[in-house]
Amino acid sequence: GYIKRVRNGVFSFNDLKGRQGIILCETAQKLKNYMDELGFYYYISGLDILAKYMLHIPEQYPVIAFIEKAAKEEIYNNLLAEGFEVIEPQYTKKMYEDAMLSGSHNMQVILYTTEDFQYSSEGLASIEKAFADLYFAITRNGYPLSLQELVRIYQNLSRLGNIDKKKLITVASRRNIQYDIRFIVENRFITDSAIEFGKILRREE
């Protein structure tokens, strides 16, 4: 079959299907099953696609998902009725912190809308799309993962040759974070002098 159980609450997609052993948390797996039933275009992105490149996978985290813009209201209502806690991206930090305090942070899904499904397949984002989306969520919306963890993910992806850096920059331009991502991708070619120059320039502006 497509899916095999790895451990309690974690599922993986068989390598034979070309998904490179992607690990989904239980919430993401439930979301995938339900969205497949509904029949709308969608894809899961972020940490679920990249979890295998982490040393320590968090026990719980909000799932990042993209859904077709035209069907937002219908999907939103269906997910709420199914018991998912649907989060608007701009409220990520607050909703997660509130849930942590109340102990009710199960089945949290951050929903982004899109009309572009180019960088996804079978309801799952490509590695490059997942990284750009996770970077955006952390740096722009306060997603609960440290930049240090994201650096480790990037280092592992690079070391294993599992990320296409040109494609990553292209994908990043769709989220308007291409300058950030280009800096990350080209970081080892940038001298300390140039970094210092940039810091001074920022202070002067």
PLM segments and residue spans:
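Short gly/ser-rich loop at a beta-strand->alpha-helix junction or flexible surface loop bordering the NTP-binding
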Residues: G9, L24-N106
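Short, charged/polar, Gly/Pro-enriched secondary-structure boundary elements
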Residues: K17-L24
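Hydrophobic alpha-helical interaction segments
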Residues: I87-E205
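Hydrophobic beta-strand residues in large extracellular and virion-surface proteins
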Residues: I3, A65, V109-L111
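Short, flexible beta-strand-to-coil junctions
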Residues: R7, K69-A70, F136-T139
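Minor-groove-contacting beta-hairpin "wing" of winged helix-turn-helix DNA-binding domains
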Residues: G9-D15
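Generic structural motif
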Residues: L16, E68-A70, T114
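A short, conserved structural fragment
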Residues: G1-N8
